[in-house]
Amino acid sequence: MDIRKESLKKHYEWNGKIEVVSRVPINSAEDLSLAYTPGVAEPCLEIQKDYDKSFELTRRNNLVAVVTDGTAVLGLGDIGPEAGMPVMEGKCALFKEFGDVDAFPICVRSKDVEEIVNAIYLISGSFGGINLEDIAAPRCFEIEKKLKEKCDIPIFHDDQHGTAVIVAAGLINSLKLVHKNLDEIKVVMNGAGAAGIAIAKHLLNMGVKDITLCDSKGIICKGDPRLNAVKQEMAEITNLSHLEGSLTDAMKGADVFLGISAAGCVSEEMVKSMAKDPILFAMANPTPEIMPDIAKKAGAAVVGTGRSDFPNQINNVLAFPGIFRGALDCRASDINEEMKVAASFAIASLVSDEELNADYILPEAFDKRIGKTVAEAVKKAAIESGVARI
């Protein structure tokens, strides 16, 4: 089957992947007067007295906006907000299927940070959370930061943090197989965009001490005048050995390679130069940084990719539905680092020691335990870290 052609055919048939369904019966004049006028005036007046009542008297408690400007859609790049709509609808369908979260696509016709921030802020009173999606770096960092400062509901850029949570979960289990610890490993990352930077920060928060970050020009190091502000910040907290040079140089002696970059940029020789039993997550799509068979031939102990046709798919769908479910259930004001760390360990825990092997480091996407397990861990972390409001 040609997936691309079949998907296009199905999208014409579906004419959209989501719809609004009424939660209340409206079959009589009495039903109408309760759900709408005149009865609806009473909940309106209650909310006027206390805006937080909107979480109890409306569906706001379960609503998430999936927002994009269409500038970094999948591997397609800057295709515009309307062209990004099929992805946003798909994301909303996944929210419902895997987390029972009601999500709506919001595609914004602007590339201006202040316009986007203002647009999202102005509608934030209708939602319990905001999921930012497919917004190009470095603008995505600024948008997320400004929204977190302005809004009192969770702001979560899934391309950054969802990816980071899954990578960490996969790494936790991979390290069990090779008998190494987070605080002992040397990690090399290729790709310093939204996902790469978020992964690096998340791993540092989880106890990894030695991370070297590379971009298309080579190793990111302090004092490099070409770096933008975000990369300068990363240079301060990574590459503590002050390495210089190329990705090839960085990978020598590394325990872990994480790629969020370009197809075919890692060779068999580069894998052979790594430490014993290296772990490689080659997540470039559709063609990974190195094909799994080549990596394993070169000595890789564990290989993950972003693809579903290889073992160990690094797939955000394991994370974002449960993360938002947990955040919404306790009306969290933020999705903080403690909650993301909890999500990583929760996902990793769903693969038992008996099941764990080099081709099975993460649970399957359709494992019914995932959403509930992640949600419970995230909710607990929110309560313990003080961002839960109920």
List the model feature ranges, each with a label.
Residues Y12, F55-R60, K96-E97, L122-S124, ...:
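Solvent-exposed alpha-helices and their adjacent loops that cap or buttress functional pockets
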Residues P105, N131-D134, I155-D158, M189, ...:
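General beta-strand structural signal in soluble alpha/beta enzymes
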Residues K150-I166, L280-N285:
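Short, acidic/small-residue loops that bind anionic groups at enzyme active sites
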Residues D158-D159, A282-I390:
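Adenosine-phosphate binding glycine-rich loop
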Residues M1-I155, A381, S385-R389:
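N-terminal ligand-binding/catalytic initiation module
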Residues L74, I79-G99, H157, H161, ...:
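Glycine-rich phosphate/diphosphate-binding loop of Rossmann-like nucleotide-binding domains
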Residues Q232-A301, R307-D309:
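Rossmann-like adenosine-cofactor binding region
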